[in-house]
UniProtKB/Swiss-Prot annotation:
Protein EC: 2.4.1.34
Protein name: 1,3-beta-glucan synthase component bgs3
The protein's assembly and partners: Component of the 1,3-beta-glucan synthase (GS) complex, composed of at least the alternate catalytic subunits bgs1, bgs2, bgs3, and bgs4, and a regulatory subunit chr4.
Organism of provenance: Schizosaccharomyces pombe (strain 972 / ATCC 24843)
GO biological process, one term: fungal-type cell wall biogenesis
Length: 1826
């Protein structure tokens, strides 16, 4: 009992150490695993203190402290007046015997708590209720389970009556029995949750309003949007709006119909409300994939309800057929969706080769139900319409609807970049128009007649105003294009399609009004007339009119150009559905609206000022000189001056285009800067920055715990606040100790303890030394936790987070219930012992356990001490000392302790090995870590409930078992953890045992999974959504399910995750849902904030008005609440740190500012969702295959469109794992990039981009699509600059360059005469390089600022330095290119899919061939092209700014190898080289999973597609799922862009070889023809070799195949060798023909490769049919076995096709061979540095050299084999290196020895193909400029 004032007992005790409610139970095995015999003996030793009041207790209880109360201990019922009352050492009275300090663990047998108990064959207890299997919640009566919904609480309708309603509905409608049971519990938990904080009547009323009738309910919006009220009024039967069928109202009078709706809802009886809710939930619970279509579900529910209220329902006596609802209402829709994506081939379902624009998806079907026209189109098999049928019979006619006939595409997700043009037309209008203003104003030479640079001619004022004013026409033209695209993307048969023609006419008028003044000035006014005053006035009016046009079209969304059409009138509801479901945007409060406007106004002011002065003014002089520059005396023998004379114009066009791209780039730069500043300011405003003095943070922490975490207004005043605070604080500290984050010595200084006082027989409750030191301002944290440790981070964030603005906590019984949902597919559940202590890969040098020990040395030391204490191998005195130093530990450790420090155990008993497995699993990215962390919610709730209810034990009559049961019951009422284990039924033995371990550790944990019955002959197997928990009994070794609900079929129609979540949604409980990934974590101290977090949804207050009044609350609900995340993998090396930094800045810094300005969406982990809001609007994600690969973000867009508010919580965080290896990080960025490409095609982007207000549209764009397009623009700008380098270098190398002074007069003469003024272009290039450099490195700013706020200056600077010295800028370049390539390839080829990125520790060396094949297409090819161009630019027009580009370009090529673990291990390098050569050569005579030919064919398949009609197993990695790319996209990407690249390089080459300045045209040479001949030469050589070898294979193949199986491989190797020789010979020949000019030869190689690339793309795109998946054609080519081989259809066609393929492949092989060896040679200097592997490993893993990873251990045979391989292949490698060097050196030496004269006369002998060596030939009598 609890003692009151003046009472005390000398023997009073308080519980101080607990397990479950206070401590993360990762190691509290004795309590967690009571049901598992093999684990029964595991116990975690409790820490022992040198305190006479602490003593050991048995396993069921914890240590206790005794203290006598002081008479004045509980005087103040109000808030404490000062911090001292929390941390002072006065004598606080602690109740005797109340045991209120901490709640006890679960772990008592069920038989001690329940009467009806059975035991399975394994001795596991479970509860049985009748014939059904029930968990602990169902074993007791409804009053105990739903404590707030009972007769005592005046529930308007009792649970038993609600159950009867469910039973009746299930029987008469044909719902499944388990669905009925599940949905009954679903509704009751929801009612119980609401009734806990308001009256049951209010709970029912508000719940009904949220689901059915309230102003924000989705059903009500659908009801009026599709004009269902008019259907009901016409039918004259009972409906949602009229109780009296004779009621007459005007059909189109919406206000009258709404009044009838409100009246009807208000008149409903409680029975009817329950009936409506139950029917809706039953429909929803059994709808499986139809849950993704909320309005379709509304229609089904409405039809069902019409039958419910009809007389036929009351007259129905017999139950409906089994599963009637599923088979007749849901399955036809499921079959429609399934058949849209799959077809049957060879008696198997295969995915159709259709892209999104040809697939009727979820949204297309759902959108049909938005409009009355769509409902009227629902045809039955007899041709009639369902809406014409009798209302009561419609439910039974649902199965007769011809879904295939009535459904149509409502939006075309065509794969094109034009979606960006349409969706964000306002972005392009604003930027391109302003760019036009700036650039045209600074390009006066273009519109100045008779301009001459010596005269400094200036344009007329009219022209100077009118030319920039054409920006209005540009803006209007962009709008015109966007409207044309809208007419295409939105089919005109869509009832919601807005008319386009009126807006087209309006925009056309704007275009005309902007063009006419310019035509008048420039077309109908001569140079003299342009100076007239009247023309000036026209120019002024035109200019300001254009500004108005640009501003109007920038700010006004495209659909609203002629007015806000969505704002419906009472007489028309045509666009009401669009308003409700696409544009119901919750407006921001005025303060945040002004903040958003201020942010973007600041961004654009800074951007436009910087762009004008830094970019535009710097391009003014290049434009002035290049526009009027005319090269003289340049000539080619074949094409004359047709190309070279226009070289300045080509260069100018590249300058303009590059400047435009850079103009887009710096907007994102300024957005990042200003957004970061706003986020910083808000962080200080909220008080969450570390810059608050630590003395204030920690000294105020007890006070903040009391007023923030506890419901202090409802606390008993009998106890001082310190008593409450002490329990909370001690729980957190002990939890960290149990997680081995704190040592025992540290723990002692962090706990509240009882010490003796000066009063006899009394105890004082002493504050921890930690708080006392903080109050004194002493900075002695080392005495309490290690610096930079996980404990310090968690304590620091906990203290900082409580200093901000946080809602008050409500008592636990009054808090809403919630569920954590974790989708799981193949992620590790619990690491096995084999995975921990054995190397998992032959290329790995370390075991997982060893690596984790090096990453977490202090945690491991604590774990070892704990294990030794448990095993009895350490004394008490040893536990008092702190952990020894590394040296001291080695000296003090005897042989018996070595097993502990090596593997964590000495005995192989399961209880010891399990501890090591768990220790490693809790430091890896495993499901066990996630589930264990999330179960902290249960522990926190039990703790908070026990702490805030000191009299709880008295209420239980001192029975601790009853107390524990009551705590568990409360936690179970408020929190559920559901893991959606899609594959559970197909788990192997290890996976099943691990899942079973989870259930035994946490019996209340729920697992939802897919199960199926064995298929019968001719029938598909029946699939079930199944739920189990730890209380379910076993049958045949498997747990019997609690619920088993049949589905229409396999629900995984999409990419998996969204379908998996949707399958589990009916099994979640409560009002809110937290979505968690399977690689996250949570902490006890964060879980204690859950009540504050849920208060952010603003639904805690009781309803003061009924929602069914005109004054009812119509405020937009909070749909989502974002939270921070801490990436716990940040200390795992450079790549883990970079990935963590990205996640932290986006998840915290930018999310904070985005939530303020209304741009935040849902990004999955760890966001909280409003369950009712989201489930009634399509669920928590979307699931169309490919289109919704980034499934989470669509839920955010749906919530934003449909009226939900999205907030961000900055004081709560969860742990998050991130990818740690190079490959996994790149896979993740690829998934995000391709997902962005798919998002751009979606209708969500269409609606949001075109309808959001201007400032919110900017926030939405730059937070999502703008980031990815910025990466695209960065890479485009780099490639454009390289083209500028090439074209400028070609001119710089061959002409005389003028002297240039930036401050010279505009009409200064050029010197020397005949020179070319090109230096301004070089100056402009320098500025461009600086711009790109700043854009790249500004990406580090958010992370630095984040660390400054969260960690302080020293750690922020240290982290930045570590990243820079670890070459992370190079990695950023590579990631940027990968992002750009991902979105680029996705919009060209499609094929977006969910990529399993991998969550292991990256310590394995990846073979060179794997890295090369993975990253050539995305980066290495591009990097190699750019390096060649940069090399040419460096040799011709050098500037020191190129140094940055050299680093950047090399990063694109060598990054995968730099970040490959142990890449520079000397022996491994050459062993790997052998594997690389084998990769190049194999796969030509038999299939191989990893070969160059397979890599080549896979790349080609993206364009050609796969021949699906050919039977046979696919070889290599050819996929049957990816559709063939659209020809339109392929032509743009694979033909047009390479053609542009080839054109500009050919122009540069032609000018460089046109001998400018040579007046005698008869001495011109064939430079243009030369390069085409050189490009054709290697193709001709390889073609000739192929034909010759083909004859051998066909004639001798049948004979030689019998002699040698390697006959074909030898021919293939010979052909490949010839192709390499042909390419090398071409290079040497070109070098000779260029008169040994290396710069011209490099440019020639650039052109040759550009021509090859274009030609090969043309062949693949236009000439090659589909690829044969089996690869038999390739084998037949080399071995000559064409006849009789399976898998070769239409042999003549395939023969011709294979010949073209082989010509392409031979030349690609030669380029790959040379490129790959160039990369290897570039790595050789680093390889030759002694012991380079050690510093390289330090760079990658951030491990101290003393903790370096050991070399692998091989057997003698393996060592001998490796040694032979090393000698052979190192010799071959260096021989090839010498050969490559000789190809460069030998020609130079021969040139010096032979002294060959490269004169024109000798060139004539070579048909003018040789370039004469003439040098620069300036003509002083001619000028290049006018």
């Amino acid at each position: 009992m609890d003692y009151k004032k003046g009472e005390h007992s000398p023997s009073s005790s308080i519980q101080i150490l607990s397990d479950d409610a206070t401590i993360n139970s990762n190691y509290a095995y004795g309590e967690q695993l009571q049901s598992n015999d093999q684990y029964n003996n595991i116990q975690h030793p409790a820490p022992s203190f040198a305190n006479p009041f602490i003593h050991e207790q048995d396993d069921s209880y914890s240590d206790i402290l005794e203290e006598e109360p002081d008479e004045d201990a509980y005087d103040s019922p109000e808030r404490p007046s000062s911090t001292e009352e929390f941390i002072s050492q006065d004598e606080s009275n602690i109740s005797a015997g109340s045991s209120f300090m901490f709640p006890y663990n679960r772990g008592h047998p069920l038989s001690k708590r329940h009467d009806s108990i059975m035991v399975d064959e394994f001795g596991h207890e479970y509860i049985v209720e009748g014939d059904s299997i029930a968990s602990a919640d169902e074993a007791i009566d409804y009053d105990a389970l739903y404590a707030s919904w009972t007769a005592e609480t005046k529930a308007p309708i009792l649970a038993i009556d609600i159950e009867n309603i469910y039973i009746e509905l299930a029987m008469k409608f044909g719902f499944q029995w388990d669905n009925m049971r599940n949905m009954f519990d679903y509704l009751m938990v929801m009612l119980d949750s609401r009734a806990s904080r308001m009256t049951p009547q209010e709970a029912l009323l508000t719940l009904h309003a949220d689901y059915i009738g309230g102003p924000q309910s989705n059903f009500k919006k659908w009801y009026f949007a599709c004009k269902m009220d008019q259907f009901d009024l016409k039918s004259g039967v009972l409906s949602f709006i009229s109780r009296d069928p004779s009621t007459q109202v005007p059909y189109k009078d919406m206000s009258s119909c709404e009044a009838l709706w409100i009246s009807r809802m208000d008149e409903l009886s409680n029975y009817e409300r329950i009936e409506q809710l139950a029917l809706y939930l039953l429909c929803w619970g059994e709808a499986n994939n139809v849950r993704f279509m909320p309005e379709c579900l509304c229609f089904i529910y409405k039809v069902a309800y019409d039958y419910l209220i009809s007389p036929s329902f009351k007259e129905q006596k017999n139950p409906a057929p089994k599963d009637y609802f599923l088979d007749n209402c849901i399955t036809p829709l499921y079959n429609l969706m399934h058949d849209q994506q799959y077809e049957i081939r060879d008696q198997k379902y295969v995915r159709k080769e259709k892209d999104h624009a040809s697939i009727i998806g979820y949204d297309d079907i759902n959108q049909m139900f938005w409009y009355s026209k769509g409902l009227k189109a629902l045809l039955l098999s007899d041709g009639s319409r369902i809406m014409d049928a009798d209302v009561a019979s419609r439910y039974f006619l649902l199965a007769d609807i011809q879904w295939q006939r009535v459904c149509y595409k409502s939006f075309r997700e065509s794969r094109t970049w034009l979606h960006f043009l349409h969706n964000f037309s306002r972005i392009w209008i604003l930027h391109i128009s302003v760019f036009w203003y700036f650039t045209v104003y600074n390009s006066p030479t273009i519109y100045t007649p008779n301009f001459h640079y010596l005269e400094g001619t200036q344009p007329a004022r009219a022209a100077k105003w009118c030319a920039p004013a054409l920006a209005g026409a540009v803006a209007s033209f962009i709008s015109f294009l966007a409207l044309i695209l809208e007419a295409y993307f939105v089919p005109r048969n869509n009832p919601g399609a807005q008319p386009v023609i009126p807006r087209l006419i309006f925009v056309s008028i704007l275009i005309a009004l902007n063009i006419v003044p310019a035509a008048f000035i420039f077309g109908f006014s001569n140079a003299t007339q342009q100076h007239y005053r009247s023309r000036e006035i026209v120019g002024y009016v035109h200019f300001f009119f254009s500004i108005g046009c640009v501003a109007y079209q920038s700010f006004i969304p495209l659909p609203f150009l002629l007015g806000p059409r969505f704002k419906f009138r009472s007489s028309s509801r045509k666009y009401l559905a669009n308003s409700y479901f696409t544009n119901d945007i919750a407006s921001l409060p005025w303060g945040r609206t002004l903040l958003s406007a201020a942010l973007w106004i600041t961004v654009f002011i800074a951007k436009f000022v910087e762009s004008y002065y830094f970019l535009t003014l710097s391009v003014r002089d290049p434009i002035r000189f290049l526009q009027r520059m005319k090269p003289y005396d340049c000539y080619d023998f074949m094409i004359g001056a047709s190309l070279c004379s226009h070289q300045p114009k080509f260069l100018l066009s590249l300058v303009y285009l590059t400047d435009l791209v850079l103009f887009f780039l710096d907007t994102y730069l300024w957005y990042m800067l200003i957004s970061t500043m706003f986020s910083i300011a808000y962080s200080f405003y909220m008080g969450s920055a570390i810059w608050t003095p630590w003395r204030v943070i920690f000294s105020n922490l007890p006070r903040r715990i009391y007023f923030t975490l506890l419901a202090y207004k409802d606390l008993s005043t009998e106890f001082k606040p310190k008593i409450y605070v002490g329990q909370i604080w001690n729980s957190i500290m002990i939890s960290m100790y149990r997680e081995h984050l704190l040592s025992l010595e540290h723990l002692k200084g962090l706990l509240y303890q009882q010490v003796g006082s000066e009063y006899f027989g009394k105890q004082t409750f002493q504050s921890p030394k930690f708080f006392m030191e903080a109050a004194k301002g002493l900075n002695k944290w080392d005495a309490f936790f290690r610096r930079n440790s996980e404990a310090e981070r968690r304590i620091s964030f906990f203290a900082q987070s409580l200093g901000g603005k946080i809602p008050d906590a409500v008592p636990v019984p009054k808090m809403p219930s919630f569920t954590v949902l974790i989708p799981h597919y193949g992620e590790k559940i619990l690491l096995s012992l084999r995975e921990i202590i054995r190397e998992q890969d032959p290329m790995s040098r370390i075991t997982l356990l060893e690596y984790l020990k090096q990453l977490y040395p202090n945690d491991w030391d604590n774990f070892v001490q704990d294990t030794k204490l448990m095993a009895g191998d350490v004394g008490v005195e040893e536990t008092k000392s702190d952990v020894k130093s590394e040296k001291g530990k080695k000296q003090g450790t005897v042989k018996e302790d070595l097993p502990f420090y090596c593997i964590g155990f000495k005995s192989t008993a399961p209880e010891y090995t399990l501890r090591t497995r768990i220790w490693a699993s809790l430091r890896s990215q495993t499901l066990y870590r996630t589930a264990s962390g999330m179960m902290n919610y249960s522990r926190a709730l039990k703790l908070l409930y026990r702490v805030e209810q000191p009299n709880l034990l008295d209420d239980c009559d001192g029975n601790f078992e009853r107390l524990e049961h009551q705590l568990e019951q409360m936690a179970y009422r408020k929190f559920r953890l559901c893991i959606s284990m899609q594959r559970y039924a197909k788990f192997n033995r290890d996976e099943y045992e691990n899942a079973e371990f989870l259930l035994r550790a946490h019996p209340e944990l729920q697992i939802a999974y897919l199960d199926q019955d064995p298929s019968e002959d001719g029938e598909e197997p029946k699939v079930y959504a199944t739920l189990i928990n730890g209380f379910c009994p076993f049958e045949n070794g498997r747990r019997l399910p609690k619920y088993r609900i049949r589905l229409s079929g396999n629900p995984i129609l999409g990419d998996g995750k969204a379908d998996n979540q949707n399958m589990a949604l009916p099994f979640v409980r409560g009002e809110y849902l937290q979505l968690i990934d399977a690689n996250q974590d949570n902490y006890i101290e964060e879980c204690m904030k859950i009540r504050n977090v849920l208060s952010e949804f603003e639904e805690m207050d009781c309803a003061t008005l009924t929602p069914y009044t005109k004054k009812g609350n119509a405020r937009h609900p909070v749909a989502m609440l974002g939270a921070r995340e801490y990436v716990f993998s940040e200390n795992s090396g450079i790549l883990g740190d970079v990935a963590a930094g990205k996640e932290q800045t986006f998840g915290t810094l930018f999310s904070r500012s985005l939530a303020l300005i209304g741009g935040k969406l849902h990004y999955g982990h760890p966001d909280f969702l409003n369950t009712i809001f989201m489930t009634t609007r399509g669920g928590v994600s979307k699931a169309q295959k490919g289109l919704h690969v980034n499934e989470d973000i669509y839920a955010g867009m749906t919530a934003l469109q449909r009226g939900g508010r999205i907030k961000h919580c900055d004081y709560f965080q969860c742990g998050k794992g991130r990818d740690l290896g190079f490959g996994t990080i790149i896979n993740f960025t690829t998934k995000i990039g391709t997902g962005m490409g798919e998002q751009s095609l979606s209708r969500e982007y269409f609606y949001l981009g075109t309808q959001l207000p201007f400032f919110r549209m900017l926030s939405f764009y730059y937070a999502h699509a703008g980031f990815h397009l910025n990466n695209v623009f960065i890479m485009i700008s780099m490639q454009l600059l390289m083209l500028v380098f090439v074209n400028l270098g070609a001119m710089y190398h061959t002409v005389e360059i003028c002297d240039y002074q930036a401050g010279a007069a505009i009409n200064a003469s050029l010197y020397p005469p005949g020179c070319y003024m090109l230096k301004p272009v070089l100056d402009w290039i320098r500025r461009c390089i600086i711009s790109i450099f700043i854009v790249f490195f500004i990406s580090f700013l958010p992370l630095v600022v984040h660390d400054l706020l969260e960690k302080g200056v020293i750690r922020a600077v240290a982290r930045l330095c570590k990243q820079i010295f670890s070459l992370s800028p190079m990695f950023e370049v590579f990631v940027t290119q990968n992002y750009a390539n991902s979105i680029f390839t996705n919009l060209t080829y499609g094929g977006a899919r969910y990529i399993a990125t991998g969550r292991g520790l990256a310590t394995t060396r990846v073979p060179f061939s794997v890295l090369y094949s993975l990253y050539t297409g995305s980066s290495i090819y591009l990097g190699s092209r750019l390096i060649m161009m940069l090399l040419f630019g460096t040799m011709t027009v050098w500037t020191t700014h190129y140094v940055y580009f050299w680093v950047t370009m090399f990063a694109l090529v060598i990054c995968p190898f730099i970040y490959n673990p142990h890449q520079f291990s000397f022996v491994d390098f050459f062993v790997d080289y052998r594997e690389f050569l084998r990769w190049l050569s194999r796969g030509n005579t038999k299939g191989h999973a990893h070969s160059w030919i397979g890599f080549c064919r896979l790349a080609r398949t993206r364009i050609t597609g796969v021949n699906r009609k050919v039977k046979g197993s696919p070889s290599n990695k050819l996929t049957m799922d990816m559709p063939r790319a659209g020809l339109r996209n392929v032509i743009f990407t694979e033909v047009f862009l390479p053609a542009c690249f080839a054109f500009f390089t050919i122009c540069a080459y032609t000018f460089m070889n046109s001998q400018p300045g040579l007046e005698d045209k008869s001495r011109a040479v064939n430079g243009f023809i030369r390069i085409w001949i050189m490009a054709a030469l290697p193709i001709a050589i390889s073609t000739a070799a192929l034909l010759i070898l083909l004859m051998f294979s066909c004639m001798l193949g049948p004979l030689l195949r019998k002699c040698s199986k390697r006959y074909g491989a030898v021919l293939a190797a010979l052909a490949h060798a010839v192709s390499v020789f042909g390419l090398v010979f071409t290079f040497e020949a070109l070098w000779f023909l260029e008169a040994w000019s290396f710069s011209k030869t490099v440019l020639g190689c650039i052109v040759i490769f550009a021509i090859h690339r274009l030609v090969f793309k043309l062949v693949v795109v236009f000439l090659l049919p589909r690829e044969v998946a089996s690869g038999e054609n390739n084998y037949s080519w080399w071995d000559g076995h064409w006849f009789g081989r399976k898998g070769i259809p239409y042999m003549p066609i395939q023969f011709i096709r294979e010949f073209m393929c082989k010509v392409v492949e031979m030349n690609l092989f030669a380029m790959d061979f040379i490129l790959s060896h160039c990369i290897l040679f570039s790595l050789t200097p680093i390889l030759c540095i002694p012991f380079i592997d050690i510093p390289h490993s330090v760079l990658l893993f951030w491990l101290h050299p003393s903790r370096q990873i050991r070399p692998p251990i091989y057997t003698r045979k393996q060592n001998q084999l490796r040694r032979r391989t090393f000698y052979r292949y190192s010799l071959l490698f260096f021989a090839l290196l010498c050969t490559f060097v000789a190809m460069i050196v030998v020609p130079l030496v021969l040139d010096q020895k032979l002294s060959y004269q490269f004169k024109f006369e000798n060139s004539v002998k070579f048909f003018r193909l040789m370039q004469p060596s003439l040098g620069v030939l300036p003509n002083t009598n001619k000028n290049t400029s006018e």
